[in-house]
A protein has these predicted regions:
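Aromatic- and acid-rich polysaccharide-binding/catalytic face
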Residues: 1, 5-7, 45-49, 53-94, ...
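An active-site-proximal structural segment forming one wall of the substrate-binding cleft
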Residues: 1-5, 22-37, 56-66, 130-139
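Active-site groove signature of glycoside hydrolases
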Residues: 1-20, 44-46, 107, 144-152
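Extracytoplasmic/secreted cell-surface and envelope-processing proteins
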Residues: 12-16, 53-56, 79-82, 114-118, ...
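Aromatic-lined substrate-binding rim segments of carbohydrate-active enzymes
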Residues: 17-45, 86-87, 99
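Short, glycine/charged-enriched secondary-structure capping and boundary segments
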Residues: 17-20, 58-60, 85-86, 120-122, ...
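Aromatic-rich peripheral "rim/lid" segments of glycoside hydrolase catalytic domains that contact
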Residues: 62, 117-118, 122-124, 138-182
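Catalytic-core region of carbohydrate-active enzymes that cleave or remodel glycosidic bonds
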Residues: 83-145
Length: 182
């Protein structure tokens, strides 16, 4: 069984070194307690795939020193939520595996929007899915878990609610991204 203590923590912690240090103390305490309850439990913390190569990489590496696995979410998007080409999957997976080192890589969320507003399409989304499966096969057993987030598009009201929740209710691209992941 896997336990991730935190989801996309790099988004919240950013480049705030004291916040990373405080989170590391919390994480190590929570992980220690969880291991006492179930020594067979595999414990990690989830970050975005971008954290492997941005300003958070060193902090995330330190946080993962005591993890049993490295967990990431993977959505190949630009900062404005437009899509990167589906062909980036191979190099992105290699970067994530390299970042994970000898530890297993858990892809807690994987997705690619199909919205034309974001420069995508159903065909691009399908190519992304094919490329993910090919890269997963190529990784051998290094990725024990991969989860596609949303296998269907959600209702516009849900996208609006998520936009408000994330403080991005005025971002048409963010909502187009969320509404076309399925």
């Amino acid at each position: 069984a896997y336990l991730s203590i935190g989801n996309e923590v790099d988004v919240f912690l950013g480049t705030n070194a004291p916040a990373w240090a405080a989170y590391q103390r919390f994480y190590e305490d929570a992980a220690g307690h969880a291991r006492q309850l179930d020594p067979s439990l595999k414990i990690g913390v989830t970050a975005t795939a971008d954290a492997a190569s941005n300003a958070a990489a060193a902090s995330l590496t330190a946080l993962n020193r005591t993890s049993d696995f490295v967990a990431m979410t993977y959505y190949p998007l630009n900062a404005d939520f437009t899509v990167r080409p589906p062909s980036t999957v191979v190099s992105d997976m290699q970067k994530m595996l390299s970042f994970a080192g000898a530890k297993p890589l858990v892809l807690q969320e994987v997705g690619y929007p199909a919205s034309t507003q974001l420069g995508s399409s159903d065909a691009a989304q399908a190519a992304f899915v094919r490329n993910v499966f090919q890269a997963w096969d190529s990784a051998g057993g290094r990725i024990p878990l991969l989860n596609f987030f949303l296998l269907h598009d959600v209702a516009p009201a849900q996208c609006e609610a998520w936009g408000s929740y994330y403080g991005l209710s005025n971002s048409a691209n963010f909502k187009a991204y969320l509404c076309s992941l399925g």
